[in-house]
Every structure is written in C-alpha cells, then in structure tokens.
A protein has these predicted regions:
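N-terminal helix-turn-helix
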Residues: 36-68
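Beta-hairpin "wing" of winged helix-turn-helix
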Residues: 30-31, 35, 63-72, 78-79
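Extreme N-terminal segment that seeds HTH/winged-HTH DNA-binding domains in transcriptional regulators
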Residues: 1-36, 42, 86, 92-121
Length: 121
C-alpha cells in the first residue's frame, strides 16, 4: 500500500484527522460500503502514524456505527452509511464552510463562469 504524505494539523488529535480521512474515503468510494478496510498496520503505514492511533480511529468509527468488525477478518464499511455521511457533510459544509467561501468569492468578484472555466479572464 502506497504511503500518502500527510500534514497533520496541530489543533486536532491525529486519530480524529485520520477518521476524517477515512470518512472522506467512504464518501469518494475509496472505501466502498461492504468492502474491507486496510488492516490497522496497513493504515498506520499508509498514513505514517502509530498503529495505536490507527486502531483508535477505527474504534471511533466503529462506535459511530460506520464500520463493523468481522471476527477474524477485519473491518468493513457498513452498508447504507454513505448516504447518511453525505447528508451530514453537506449540512456541515453549507453551515460552516460555505458562508466564508461565498463571502470571499464576492470580495474577489468571482462569478460562476470563472469557477467553472478555472480562469479569471
């Protein structure tokens, strides 16, 4: 498994940031519903974190009902969780991130044409 270079933020525990990465992976189908997640060791190596940190991220995802353990096999993403995550993440984005982004776009006079073309001309 290829390492993913990652810059961890100082204002949040690494296991929480790792959980966010895994949730993003569920949302973008890197970790599809019903599929196995990497082993704790594999996840730790991939993100260059301590295996205890990877295990804690998995425990918290399990506690949140997003993944389940299959005895002797590992963890899988539970079926049906992506839709709920998508709803939650959209609501969070619209409440927490969009207002600031929209204000910045207005200050810079960026319109939809510019956004979709990727050009300021």
């Amino acid at each position: 498994m290829k390492k993913r270079p990652h810059k961890w933020k100082n204002d949040q525990a690494i296991y929480q940031q790792l959980m966010d990465e895994l949730i993003a992976g569920i949302l973008d189908h890197t970790y599809p519903e019903g599929e196995m997640l990497p082993s704790v060791r594999g996840l730790a190596e991939r993100y260059d974190v301590n295996p205890l940190t990877a295990a804690k991220a998995y425990r918290e995802l399990q506690r949140a009902g997003l993944v389940e353990a299959l005895r002797g096999e590992g963890l899988i993403v539970r079926n049906g969780v992506r839709a709920g995550l998508m709803k939650r993440e959209r609501a969070r984005f619209l409440k927490e991130e969009w207002p600031e982004l929209r204000a910045r776009l207005a200050r810079l006079e960026v319109d939809a044409r510019m956004l979709f073309s990727g050009s300021a001309d």
